[in-house]
Amino acid sequence: LRAANGHAKPFNLQYIGLGNENWGAVYERNFKALYKAVKEKYPQITVISSAGTYLEGDAYDGNMAWIDREFKDTVVDEHYYTYDGYLFDHNDRYDRFDRSGAHVFVGEYAATSAGIGTIETKSNIWEAVEEASYLTGLERNGDVVDMASYAPTFAKVNAQSWNVNLIWFDSRQTVLTPSYYVQMLFANNV
């Protein structure tokens, strides 16, 4: 199939994600089976596991303990959209992570302001500064945090699912948000 679509050689695939915001017994069962199959055929590929939906609480704690106990060689995908100062207050989140456990991929993150839906709360400068502050914590903990990606990226004006996005567009224009410039700042200078 790959060759038929114009790419004869295998891709240099380094990561494969198994799950998206999953946790619990069904995920554990399915993950174990898929992890085993991937590692038997492609031992060099790093498997990305799921931390679940939240940054804290019983489901998160249980998932992380299970991953650290059985799958330390994975990279754990964490997702979070936070409100009003959370990223400022948790800039040190990864300072206390176990260095011998699974590494982290912050696969989705964004700061969001209260009052979602107003023009003032859509991708504003306060959120961008908060995200920049948080990224300094991710960089400081580069021995644990392997990757991070802002989400979501694109939004069509009046047809979006989220009110925080890096790039807004309509049929006439494109707007790059303050959060976009934070991502560019870090991508080009860190």
Language-model regions, residue ranges each:
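Catalytic-core region of carbohydrate-active enzymes that cleave or remodel glycosidic bonds
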Residues: K36-K39, P43-T46, A65-D68, V75-N189
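N-terminal catalytic cores of secreted or lumenal carbohydrate-active enzymes
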Residues: L1-K41, I45, S49-M64, E70
